[in-house]
Amino acid sequence: MSVSTKAELMPAMEQAWLALNRELNLLSEAQMVQQKDATGWSVKDHLAHLTAWARSVLFFLQGRDRHAGLGVPEMVYLSEDEDQINAAIYAQHIDQPLADVLQQFRATYAQLLALVEPLTDDDLHKPYSHYLPNEPGDGDGPPAINVIYGNTVHHFQEHMRWIASLVVTE
């Protein structure tokens, strides 16, 4: 599913955020840090990952390089190899304390929400290239609303399923 208007985007973002936080509130610190999935990721690692991608959207909307928002080298980002990008994000946050990850997750989402709030439907339908005209890529890219939705609502829902299954199976 996707959205096509700000009137659809804002409640979808809120619902996905609240649902993910309800799931997180059920977990102990030990569950968030010690339990690992098949790839070795903990709940904390999933949250650091979500934070990095949400921050990349924040940077995108500000016209700043997304690789800087992700915290990965430009060449890694430009490779478009999501596994390599995600591995770089993981390595960057592996030793970060849970409290810091949670604080950054909440702060990044609040900053992103504050940046999206004043945007109009016209702003949200401007293509990727409007926000990052110098980033290489084919054509104009997707509309901003798709970038925002994909890296918040869709991404939160995707990782919430993984987090829930990780905790249930342990």
List each language-model region with its residue ranges:
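Short, glycine/alanine-rich amphipathic alpha-helical segment
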Residues: 40-42, 88-90, 143
